[in-house]
Amino acid sequence: MSRRKQAKPRSLKDPNCKLEDTSEDGESPDCKKRQEEGDELEEEEAVHSCDSCLQVFESLSDITEHKISQCQLTDGADIEDDPTCSWPASSPSSKDQASPIHGEGFDFGEEEGIPGLPYPCQFCDKSFSRLSYLKHHEQSHSDKLPFKCTYCSRLFKHKRSRDRHIKLHTGDKKYHCSECDASFSRSDHLKIHLKTHTSNKPYKCAICRRGFLSSSSLHGHMQVHERNKDCSQSGSRMEEWKMKDTQKCSQCEEGFDFPEDLQKHIAECHPECSPNDDRGALQCMYCHELFMEETSLLNHMEQIHNSEKKNSCNICSENFHSVEELYSHMDSHQHPESCNPSNSPSLVTVGYTSVSSTTPDSNLSVDSSTMVEVAPPLAKGRGRKRAVQQTGDAPTSKQARVSYSCIYCSKQLFSSLAVLQIHLKTMHLDKPEQAHICQYCLEVLPSLFNLNEHLKQVHETQDPALIVSTMSAMVYQCNFCSEIFNDLNMLQDHIRSSHGFPNPVTKDSNAFFCPHCYMGFLTDTSLEEHIRQVHCELGNSRFGSPVLGTPKEPVVEVYSCSYCTNSPIFNSVLKLNKHIKENHKNIPLALNYIHNGKKSRALSPLSPITLEQSSLKMMQSLGGTPSRLAGEYICNQCGAKYTSLDGFQTHLKTHLDTVLPKLTCPQCNKEFPNQESLLKHVTIHFMITSTYYICESCDKQFTSVDDLQKHLLDMHTFGFFRCTLCQEVFDSKVSIQLHLAVKHSNEKKVYRCTSCNWDFRTETDLQLHVKHNHLENQGKMHKCIFCGESFGTEVELQCHITTHSKKYNCKFCSKAFHAIILLEKHLREKHCVFEDKTQNCGTNGASEQIQKEEVELQTLLTNNQESHNSHDGSEEDIDTSEPMYGCDICGAAYTMESLLQNHQLRDHNIRPGESAIVKKKAELIKGNYKCNVCSRTFFSEGGLREHMQTHLGPVKHYMCPICGERFPSLLTLTEHKVTHSKSLDTGNCRICKLPLQCEEDFLEHCQMHPDLRNSLTGFRCVVCMQTVTSTLELKIHGTFHMQKTGTASVVQSAGRVQNLQKLYKCASCLKEFRSKQDLVKLDINGLPYGLCASCVNLSKSASPNANVTLSTNRQVISQTDSLTCVEAKNYKTSVLKTRCSSCNVKFESETELQNHIQTIHRELTSENSATQLKTPQVSPMARISPQSDEKKTYQCIKCQMVFYNEWDIQVHVANHMIDEGLNHECKLCSQTFDSPAKLQCHLIEHSFEGMGGTFKCPVCFTVFVQANKLQQHIFSAHGQEDKIYDCAQCPQKFFFQTELQNHTMSQHSS
């Protein structure tokens, strides 16, 4: 079976693995390491590929079925012997069955398991004859193989091997073939599969000539031939060879299956280690045994294989005496036009040459052919005698022995053509068949046998020695002038340079020819090397050829075609005409010469001259006296005579102009003077220019810049991960995870409450939680909203609430604080006051103790009334006091602790009870730069420098977001922002249109319409709809708007002081009294309280139902004795009529309320109507007409259309989704979203990239830490008129520039 890697056979244990230094499992460390490497290689052998076609399969059942159906593996013994079929197929359905791969239930036979067999077990002393038996047995050692496959129950020693094996079951095939649709789970499987798409099969069978891609496939194929043989001699020899250690190369340790592969590897890769460099190896055609000499090969074939084969032809069953005669006879079957094949060719001692033609149109286009060397008689003769037919009277002693050389391994010499043929068919079977040319008559012959027959019959009477001697006496005359050359190369160079040969020599043309064998070469250097190596001539015979001294020396008559680029040579005009008819049919001028019967020598620039003319020319070239006159320049085409050489050459050029072919463009038939201009012109027809963007790293081409940028980001960029705790940088996600686990993962205990599942870091926090929530609440149902403390009665709770009053007021902004430290901090940060000003900001009241107690009691009672004054029975009580709970992380202030806890849980992921952890986090995030004046810390030096300016003087660093003017303090900026209000002349609420009479009504009304999106205060101005950042700003808005309505703030303050002096409230029922004597003074926990008589009596008679009685009593008293006017009661009644009973939403009219109930709560209305009247349901489509005065409050994000109610906007958005789908693409980064709101939030993030994670409103400059918070703020606080960026092509407007860019690219891009 084909393997990706050739693993070391496990039959040989490492002798270095000793038992002295053993580890835990009894193996030495080195031995254990080598065994693990071997196990990895063994797991890699799980590739299932066919030996014949190299097709890869995922399971062994598939490859078995493939071999039976497609590769004709029908013999049962073949399947059994095949190592790929020794492992059962695994599938996910077999995991519930008993595993067939365990060794307990497998019958190996009696001879298996005994010591001494080739494959020993690494866990016990047993050994086996086959590797498949060993694998089955190893599965029984479950204690040594801890990792198990969940699909087929196969055991593995390593986890990575098990995971790699599981991919074969799960079908995770991420490696795809580029040639076909095949996919594989491993890359090595894909590499093996890719070999099936290659047409090159270098490994060929010597018996049936079938090609294979790998040596292992050839080895498996050879086993089929061995089983078909009747004799087992070669099979036993192959088994003996497999048992030897000579399968490995001694130089590079590469393994081979056959000796011929090893010998071929040594000859090609390690020629210095070859046993004989001068003579190559000869291989027997029957048993593939190698021999260094011809005598040894012939003797081996006569002695070993003569009795078996008897040299009989497989086609006609004719027997021959020698192997040489058999090979010659077999060639005759392939070429029936040759001589009688039954005549055995006699070995004549003549040489032969072969000249190749590289003309594209020529039928004789071959690369090279057999070469011949004229050598002296060999010193070592053959071991047997051969019958040679001697014809003629020439004695054999005068005939020279000719040696033959192979064109593929030029160092080998052969004494006969038959031996050379044996060598070619055994050692160079993959080489193409060559055409052979006779050196005497230049006849082209298809095979060595035909050449041998031709030499024997045609040139048998010629003396080889004489022929060899005449080869050097050939001279050539130029057909266009009288120049004579003794070398063919010199003549061709002369024609190209002197007579303007039109077609330049191409790259593949043979420009230089050997004077001995006429073999062509591309360069002069390669020709000289060929002459030196093949013909054993040290000098340059190309330029040193002997010249004839007498005019009686022969002249070779050759003809060359001028239409071919390399001028092929022919020995007769008939062959030249035949060549022109076959290869140059499209040239009418050449056909005219043929049809007219001319022996056109104009077509042959290599035409010969007479012997006398050649002798005269040679004598002139040697410096002798000229023996011919000047008038002897005769044109061989027309017979014209010229007395000068210049005139003769000019005349010949006229013949060339009529004969030479014209260079025309095949596309437009335009004529050109030379080949270079023709090539440039034709290139224009086939040339097209295109622009590509090439990656500088991997040279990949892309058609657009975006594709190139995406490729660079995906393949050639590195993403780094920075730890925000220690600022260390890592190159991968795994590295930073490991860093966080090692450096910043401190183990801490978490205490969890089992009742509410809250986690606490310390046991003290948990105890405090249990105390306030699970221990005291059993009997105390009244809980303080500020500190969370519980009380048994409502009187105790009301008395406790008075302790949360603020005693220290700021004289600049009227803020109040619980402690003097908070007041001093407020003065430093907000008003830049660093002196001790608290003596002027004392407590409320005079210095006398009596007045102080009276004022304190009145203040406490007033605060209780304000904190418990409700607007509706369904609404919660809202505290109007200043923010007293601040976040230690971001500085946000809230009026109630519950709001602070919600803020910490939502924004900082801090649960209630983690106060200590919050302080630690606040300490961790403190900066390293500390102010020396106020001890405030900063993260950067620039922040500290900017803060120091506040101590040096009033710097105007507060900018108005509307007009851009700067102010020195936040107070002055707040007062300035009020002047930009759009509702200066009215004091009505813009939400419910209720008129506001005083500043208290304004503050109370703002609490009725809270702004939940405002994370700082939770409120907004209900008159001008501006977002307020603090309670001070809200008060300034109330003062400003109430002044415009004619109510002076001075009169209001005087009225409040007068009311405080006259009215006294009960701490329980909040009933007001004119005199202090109407209240009973009580001392609870060291503090004085005032209660009315009825409340004192109710508190004395407190019972389990006391709470209900008190609340009922208080409602009755508040309804009868309250100081609220009748107009307020009527207003509340009207409000209740226009308020939804299900969701408590108020509407301006009853029509709007009914429409709201029918659209939003239509299920409840349908149920009520069905139970009462059982009438058909009212259609939910009833809506207010656009002609009404209702405000447009619903706007589509996509197209910015405004609608009047929620039902219309829902229908409109649904239509958008039906038409456009759920994919909304960002044109800036090509990211898609399923809703326009998410796309808008994403575009907001684009606008603030690189801003440090902060998002600022473009209208009011409010800063947010999340993009969705800014989006909610824009929807609630700003309208269509506040949008900044207008589209130039349509009326749509946008808040951010990125929205405009995305809109332009998606809607208006051409």
UniProtKB/Swiss-Prot annotation:
GO cellular component, one term: nucleus
Annotated localization: Nucleus
Organism name: Xenopus laevis (African clawed frog)
InterPro entries: Znf_C2H2_sf, Znf_C2H2_type
Family statement: Belongs to the krueppel C2H2-type zinc-finger protein family.
Compositional bias (Basic residues): 1-10
Protein function: Transcription factor that can both act as an activator or a repressor depending on the context. Involved in BMP signaling and in the regulation of the immature compartment of the hematopoietic system.
MF term (GO), any: zinc ion binding
This protein's name: Zinc finger protein 521
Residue spans of biased composition, Polar residues class: 87-97
